[in-house]
Amino acid sequence: IEKFSISNNCLTEFPNLFKDGAKSKYTASSVDFSDNHITHFKEGFLGIRAETLTLSKNPLGEGYKTGSGKKLCRMMPKELSETKSQISHLVLQNCEIDSLPPESFKNLDILEALDLSGNRLRYLPKEFDTRTMAYVSGLNLSYNCFSVFPLQAFTLPLLNKLYLTDQSDIVEDNRGNKKEIRCLKNWPTGLSTYPAYATLRLLDISYNDIQKIEEYSYPTLVTAFNVSENPNIEMTIPSDVCSKIGSGLYTLGFDSNQTIWGCSILDLDINK
């Protein structure tokens, strides 16, 4: 199989595509099962070898009720890890995933890019680290529910691109009224102590509500940083980064009405 797509159908389980599963000598370039109704893998699943596996828009994982019995939660299925599937790019957009069990990525040894955008994640497990994600260079966590900056992602030693766009959650007031809020507000300190600080080149935190980025905690080693649509942000850019912006070596995504200090060459209202 070079390319295989069965998207936009009504499948409820992921089948065995290869007779020898993950041990097959053949690797598919692309396998797409997106937009089905897949909740589980076939009993006796043997694994898969694919450069790109797309499972987007499937209600994956074991469903269970919370203590209140009102909400159905889903965990990422562990069959891919248990079968030591060989996947370079795994796409799990909009799969209703709430949590990642510790064993989720344990044996995905060649994984290089992971897209978990559009789920309901609030944290990354401590096992999400250099031992299980040693070669991951691209990570998309956009459109989830992180209220605390997922520093666990910065333990990945080869991380090059990280997307954290639009973290939101539903909150309920004392009267039972529900509303959606941007829940990621605090910028972390100590980023420079993490392995990914030296390798990360693109960081996108747009469409959040980050409050303040001090000069000493500014990510100086990235070459593309997007802070647009953070309406309450106050940020100070180091002088060396401003020089890079001026020479075209650093791309900053921002809004003209944001409070950004330290770089008069930017087209900001406060610089006019």
Tell where the protein language model's regions lie, with residue ranges.
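Leucine-rich solenoid repeat scaffolds
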Residues: 223-272
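Inter-repeat linker/turn residues at the boundaries of leucine-rich repeats
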Residues: 9, 23-26, 36, 48, ...
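Conserved hydrophobic position(s) of the canonical leucine-rich repeat
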Residues: 1, 11, 28, 38, ...
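Hydrophobic anchor residues at the C-terminal helix/turn of individual leucine-rich repeat
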Residues: 17-23, 44-46, 67-69, 80-82, ...
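Canonical leucine-rich repeat
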Residues: 14, 41, 63-64, 75-76, ...
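Acidic/polar low-complexity surface segments
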Residues: 17, 21, 57-78, 165-187
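Consensus "Asn ladder" position of solenoid repeat domains
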Residues: 6-9, 36, 58, 95, ...
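Conserved hydrophobic beta-strand positions in leucine-rich repeat
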Residues: 2-6, 29-33, 51-55, 88-92, ...
